[in-house]
């Protein structure tokens, strides 16, 4: 089968680093090609070369049988290559139709916008994707999943033959992900070629036909999904076997440190649990079960309406996040870009932001040398890959951003560390490093609460697991009794040998 799009021998260098070296990618009509690799493998650079953001140093790009060299995203878009970024590019205050045709509005012979034609054309695009909502709806009223469908419709309005999806399910619920997969199947039936960039290997094996693997800027291989198993794919991505994906520390937990009794608040109803010193408590459950809300109430980011919390035997009241920090409770958000990090600030500023009191003189003046030494130590400890501590954190990979977010929490010297989806959007190599750090914290006596939607992660890392369902606790499992089936049963509200606290 002739590819719609073919990139061969692509090389791209930046000062001091070769980002791509002889990289290749083929996209076939009616097929979904996964593009996988660790963070820093060159996936994003390859897409930027393809769309003309970066100029390639060597290699060739063929699209629809012709050699092309786009001078920018507008040229590649108009040629029929659409890209849907991880960060959606829509204006909430405009309608669906206005977003789709922004800057390309239909006009009548008097030069005025032909609203009827614009809405009719937008409705046609939505219908092509089997979407039933009206293009007159405001984008701000749509869920993230529906907004993503608008992005796809916008791409189709350019008659795109190749559509690139970058981490498309990162912010989607399971239902929205299923809808996206239906749309992808529809696009395949219309002959579109899809490039699917994701860290979620389960999805890749579900929706993709073929897989292209990059490692350290090089093309490692292209294989049909049917020829690969997950372990083999991971080995191709990281260049080594991940024999022990979830390194477990067998050090026994100590005495109870945190005791939560009948805690209630927005989306949470009378939840009780304990966490011991040197214990990793896993928190499982489906999207919307109230896991994040429970953690935010505990930390002080959401109001508590009932219940009580004791830490090392003393009552703790957290009305705001500062109260949580003051009591040694640190929460690392699931959405590090919205709640956790300031992307325009440096690695150093982000890392020390909540711990500045430890680097301040009595008059409030900063001890800059001490701050720099501590940040440098944490960068080494966490193996943060950055040219310098002054590098804007927005330029780091997802895995390195997450390490900085966790390091910042540790700088405040907490007793309880809450990690909400700590490996979301992080590649398999960086995940292993984060797991090793979590075990190190456990061995040092820190109490850790690990909230995760990835069942293998919760099972692989936790000493004990509680499960949430519709705002209530539906299960409490010692790790010896925890299985994927038991956790899933509790997550949907069935008791499967679970002990209700």
Curated annotation (Swiss-Prot):
Keywords: ATP-binding, Cell inner membrane, Cell membrane, Membrane, Nucleotide-binding, Repeat, Sugar transport, Translocase, Transport. One of its GO terms (cellular component) is plasma membrane. Its EC number is 7.5.2.7. InterPro entries: AAA+_ATPase, ABC_carbohydrate_import_ATPase, ABC_transporter-like_ATP-bd, ABC_transporter-like_CS, P-loop_NTPase. Pfam families: ABC_tran. Residues 5-241, 252-495 form the ABC transporter domain. Coiled coil: none annotated. The keyword Protein biosynthesis does not apply. The keyword Repeat applies. It is found in: Cell inner membrane. Its main location: membrane. CDD domains: ABC_Carb_Monos_I, ABC_Carb_Monos_II. GO terms for molecular function: ABC-type D-ribose transporter activity; ATP binding; ATP hydrolysis activity. It is an enzyme of class 7 (translocase). It is a peripheral membrane protein. The complex is composed of an ATP-binding protein (RbsA), two transmembrane proteins (RbsC) and a solute-binding protein (RbsB). Belongs to the ABC transporter superfamily. Ribose importer (TC 3.A.1.2.1) family. Part of the ABC transporter complex RbsABC involved in ribose import. Responsible for energy coupling to the transport system. This is Ribose import ATP-binding protein RbsA. It comes from Pectobacterium atrosepticum (strain SCRI 1043 / ATCC BAA-672) (Erwinia carotovora subsp. atroseptica). The gene is rbsA.
């Amino acid at each position: 089968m002739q590819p719609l799009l073919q990139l061969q021998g692509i090389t791209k260098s930046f000062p001091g680093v070769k980002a791509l070296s002889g990289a290749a990618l083929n996209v076939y009509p009616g097929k979904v090609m996964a593009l996988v690799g660790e963070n820093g493998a060159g996936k994003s650079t390859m897409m930027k070369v393809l769309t003309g953001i970066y100029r390639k140093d060597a290699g060739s790009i063929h699209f629809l049988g012709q050699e092309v060299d786009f001078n920018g995203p507008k040229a590649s878009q108009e040629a029929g290559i659409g890209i849907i970024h991880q960060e959606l590019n829509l204006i909430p205050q405009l309608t669906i139709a206005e977003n789709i045709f922004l800057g390309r509005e239909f006009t009548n012979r008097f030069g005025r916008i032909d609203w009827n034609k614009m809405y009719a054309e937008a409705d046609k695009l939505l219908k092509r994707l089997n979407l039933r909502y009206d293009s007159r709806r405001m984008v701000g009223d749509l869920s993230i999943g529906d907004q993503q469908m608008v992005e796809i419709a916008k791409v189709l309005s350019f008659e795109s033959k190749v559509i690139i999806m970058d981490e498309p399910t990162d912010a989607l619920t399971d239902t929205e992900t299923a809808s996206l997969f239906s749309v992808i199947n529809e696009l395949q039936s219309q002959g579109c070629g899809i490039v699917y960039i994701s860290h979620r290997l389960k999805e890749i094996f579900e929706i993709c036909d073929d897989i292209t693997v990059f490692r350290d800027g090089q093309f490692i291989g292209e294989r049909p999904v049917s020829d690969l198993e997950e372990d083999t794919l991971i080995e191709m991505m990281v260049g080594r076997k991940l024999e022990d994906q979830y390194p477990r520390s067998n050090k026994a937990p100590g005495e109870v440190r945190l005791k939560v009794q009948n805690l209630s608040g927005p989306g949470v109803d009378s939840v009780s649990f304990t966490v011991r010193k040197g214990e990793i408590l896993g928190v499982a459950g489906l999207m919307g079960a109230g896991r994040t809300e429970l953690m935010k109430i505990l930390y002080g980011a959401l109001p508590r309406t009932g219940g009580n919390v004791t830490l090392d035997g003393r009552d703790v009241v957290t009305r705001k996040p500062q109260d949580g920090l003051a009591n040694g409770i640190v929460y690392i958000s699931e959405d590090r870009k919205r709640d956790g990090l300031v992307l325009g600030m440096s690695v150093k500023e982000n890392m020390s932001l909540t711990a500045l009191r430890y680097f301040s003189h009595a008059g409030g003046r900063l001890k800059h040398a001490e701050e720099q030494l501590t940040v440098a130590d944490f960068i080494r400890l966490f193996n943060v890959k950055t040219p310098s501590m002054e590098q804007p954190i927005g330029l780091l990979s997802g895995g390195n951003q997450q390490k900085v977010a966790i390091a910042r929490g540790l700088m405040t010297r907490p007793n309880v560390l809450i990690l909400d989806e700590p490996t979301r959007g992080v590649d398999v190599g960086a995940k292993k490093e984060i797991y090793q750090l979590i075990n190190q914290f456990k061995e040092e006596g820190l109490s850790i609460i690990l909230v995760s939607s990835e069942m293998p992660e919760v099972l692989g890392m936790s000493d004990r697991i509680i499960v949430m369902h519709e705002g209530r606790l539906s299960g409490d499992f010692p790790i010896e009794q925890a299985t994927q089936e038991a956790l899933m049963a509790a997550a949907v509200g069935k008791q499967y040998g679970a002990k209700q606290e």
